[in-house]
């Protein structure tokens, strides 16, 4: 058996505790940390996640809640719809109130509708 094959065989026979101790011993001897590659990989993944962050949202009225008249007033103010159209939108929930809104605008609309008593989703 070659030296490398013997090392592989010996490592395969270690218990979990022995393997952990071996890892610590090698870290000390070589002056490295086993956690470093994980941290580097996580740091490399963060910019990719930030690049994929959603910038446009659809504001969806999930349910009007108990204060339907207040919700209709807010929908009219937000969308500029007439009374009948706003009423139909609210009663037909779930419906999209605003499409492709910026993150700030979507959050503002959501807050307005929730204050009026509606249940709102951002997609």
Curated annotation (Swiss-Prot):
Gene3D superfamilies, A to Z: 3.30.1390.10, Single helix bin
Keywords for the protein's UniProt record, in alphabetical order: Ribonucleoprotein, Ribosomal protein
A GO cellular component entry from the record: cytosolic large ribosomal subunit
Superkingdom of origin: Bacteria
GO terms assigned for molecular function: mRNA binding; structural constituent of ribosome
Annotated NCBIfam families: L12
HAMAP family: Ribosomal_bL12
Family label: Belongs to the bacterial ribosomal protein bL12 family.
Stated name of the protein: Large ribosomal subunit protein bL12
